[in-house]
Amino acid sequence: MESREFGGLGQVSALTLGGGGIGQVWGATSRDESVATLRAAVDAGINLIDLAPSYGDGEAERVFGQAFSGSVPTGLRFTTKCRLGSPAPDQVFPQLEQSLNESFERLKVDRVDLFFLHSQIIPDDSVDRYEGTPRGLFVASVMPAFERLVSDGRIGAWAITGIGVPQAVLETIKAEPQPAAVQAIANLLDSPGASKRYDEAAIPRDIIAAASQRGVGVMGIRAVQAGALTSSLDRELPEDHPEAVDYRLAAPFRSRAAEL
C-alpha cells in the first residue's frame, strides 16, 4: 500500500476507508459485513479510517468499536467529527466536548487522532442565507476549543471539512493556527453534488492548492461523487437531484472507462 505524509499524522495509506459505507449511508448492509469490511481494509494496509457521528447515526463508530473493542491496531489512525452549526460562543466547547465523548463511547477509545468540524464554514454576513458555522465564531471560539482538546490529550489534531463557502474555507486554511487537514472535493467532475449548499461556484482545486501550499493535509472526499462516477447508482433519486444530474454528465466517462 502506497503511503503519504498527512497533516502531521505521519505516514498514512494513500487510500482511506470512509465511514459512509460501513455506516449504511449509501444503502443497507449488515453489522457483520461492515465489521468484516473494516477489518479487511486494515489487513490490506489501509491505516486511516474516516468516521463521523452522522454516518448512520453513530453506526460507523459502533462498527469501529465492535471491530477492535478498544484494542486499536498499532499504527491505525482514525478520525471523527462534530456538526456544530452556530451555537452561542459559550456553548462551543461544551458541544464539541459532548459530541467527542459520545464518539469515544461508541468507538471504545479515549482519544482520536483527528477531530473534524463537520459544519460548513460560512462568512459572517451569510448566516441568514446559509446553514453552517460563521467564520468569526470559528476563529473566536471553535479554534480555541479545538486547541484545548489537543492540550488535554483527547485529540491529536483538528481539521475542517472544506465544503463550505469557498472564500471562508480558504481564509481558514491560510489563518493561524492552521488546521492539520482539510477534507476537499476530489473527483473528475470537480463536483460537490448535494453537499453544496451555497450560491458561489465550487472551487475544490483552489482549496486543494491552498492547503498544499500551507502544508495542510488533504483528504479527498466524494471521489466517485456519491456514485455518479460509477457504473450505476445504488439508490432511487429524482431526476433533478445533484447526483442524478452528475450521473448523466458522467456518461462519457463511463463509456471511456468501458473501453479501457
Go through each PLM region and give its residues:
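Structural preference for beta-strand elements that scaffold enzyme active sites
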Residues: E5, V12-T16, N47-L48, G75-K81, ...
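Short, acidic/polar
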Residues: A28-A41, Q91-R106, G164-I173
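N-terminal binding-site loop/beta-alpha segment at the start of enzyme catalytic domains
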Residues: M1-L76, N187
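Beta/alpha (TIM)-barrel catalytic core signal, keyed to glycine-rich beta->alpha loops juxtaposed to Asp/Glu
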Residues: Q120-L260
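Structural motif corresponding to the early beta-alpha repeats
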Residues: S71-P94, F116-I121
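Acidic (Asp/Glu)-rich catalytic clusters
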Residues: G7-V12, D43, G65-R77, F104-D110, ...
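CE4/NodB-like, metal-dependent polysaccharide N-deacetylase domain
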Residues: Q95-F116, R148-D152, Q183
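Active-site mouth loops of central-metabolism enzymes
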Residues: G20-D32, C82-Q95, E131-G132
